[in-house]
Amino acid sequence: MLLMVTTLAAYSQKTSLTTVNSVRPKRGDKMAFEAAYKQHIAKFHKEAQEKINVYEVLSGPYQGYYHLVNSGQSYEGLDKDRSDATAHDMDLDKTFYPLLDETMNGTYRFMDSLSIHSDVQAEKFVVNVRHIKPSLEADYRAESARSAKVQGKLKGGFWDNLSINVFEQLWDGNDPTVVSIRNLKEGFKSLETDFYGVASVGAPTFKDEYVKEYGTADWDKRVKLMDDAVVKHEQYIMKFRKDLSSQ
């Protein structure tokens, strides 16, 4: 299943939710879909609480999907209905859904303790979706928090520019899912080896700093856990579509 979200600043605990509608236009209807959605956005998604950001998947088995993202939500907000719900839904039924081949929905919670330099703004992204073994979910989260803490301390061109936002999918049954989004503020070109410069000779690596903080035995446990805990791993790149998003 496709699971994805957006780049976000660190929200407060009360507005840490993001809802995502992932859609795939029918073959041959890509441009018609974009035109119809622009009109829908202009009519129904102007207010702050209703604004939508749109992202287009550019690689992998979900290439051609769009993520329609409503971020900064709260649990309380999930109880509220739109005042224009009937007109909104009728517009979708008439101009939006007929152009789609598939649609999937999900709700995600931002994980500040697992994220690194989360306030970076970008328009290009690398997305990693990991499906976690339920029995190892708690251990995986704890270890991910450790890793983020160590990575946040590392210095140098690459580490100073590393920005990752992490989310957990809510209400995902027996398939715990963690989504990490690397924000590429310099674009896809920053994925080139040594784009931010070659590391200084003798500069501590992630492993060096981890072992310094937690010890060699814990490093060995980490390597095994991060491999054993992940049942399935998906990766793709995506870009922000400002032209399709709320203005």
What are these regions (language model features)?
Residues 1-15:
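Bacterial Sec-dependent N-terminal signal peptides
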Residues 12-247:
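Short S/T/G/P-rich N-terminal loop/turn motif that feeds into the first structured element of a domain
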